[in-house]
């Protein structure tokens, strides 16, 4: 069996809150680095299919989520080394308290699987 090695540059996608560096997005998994500017946030949103996990590599973040059983909103501070798993259907939002980076691993990503609950800095203007 021949082993194929693929070396490539990540795809950088500018966002209102910073940028996404797509490491890989294939039928099995997706890996990204989310680079945030201080004070910026992405939309409160959820995915029906995607299951994702974040690792805070740099900076600190205000993490907001909604309990879908009670409709209660919650928030917590995330610091370097914290890990959060977002299961499908869980509304969530990140806001950068300072410049920061989050490594995200997930199942395959499709833009059509993002459902916005509240606007973020990428939807303003």
Regions found by a protein language model. Give the residues of each.
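A short glycine-rich, His/Asp/Glu-containing loop-to-beta-strand
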Residues: 8-44, 50
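Short beta-strand His + acidic residue motifs that chelate non-heme Fe in jelly-roll/DSBH
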Residues: 43-45, 63-65, 86, 91-97, ...
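Glycine- and acidic-residue-biased ligand/ion/polar-headgroup-sensing regions
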Residues: 49-68
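Short acidic-glycine-tyrosine-enriched beta hairpin
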Residues: 67-89
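ATP/adenylate-binding site constellation spanning eukaryotic-like Ser/Thr protein kinases
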Residues: 39, 58, 99
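Short, surface-exposed secondary-structure edge patches
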Residues: 33, 53, 74-76
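Double-stranded beta-helix
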Residues: 3-9, 13-14, 70, 95-125
């Amino acid at each position: 069996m021949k082993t194929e090695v693929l070396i490539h540059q990540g795809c950088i996608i500018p966002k209102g809150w910073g940028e996404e560096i797509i490491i890989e997005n294939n039928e099995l998994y997706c890996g990204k680095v989310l680079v945030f500017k201080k004070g910026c946030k992405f939309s409160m949103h959820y995915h029906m299919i995607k299951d994702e996990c974040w690792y805070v590599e740099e900076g600190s973040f205000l993490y907001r989520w909604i309990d879908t059983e009670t409709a209660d909103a919650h928030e917590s501070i995330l610091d370097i080394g914290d890990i959060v798993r977002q299961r499908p259907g869980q509304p969530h939002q990140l806001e950068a308290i300072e410049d920061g980076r989050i490594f995200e691993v997930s199942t395959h990503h499709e833009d059509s699987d993002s459902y916005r609950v509240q606007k973020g800095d990428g939807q303003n203007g």
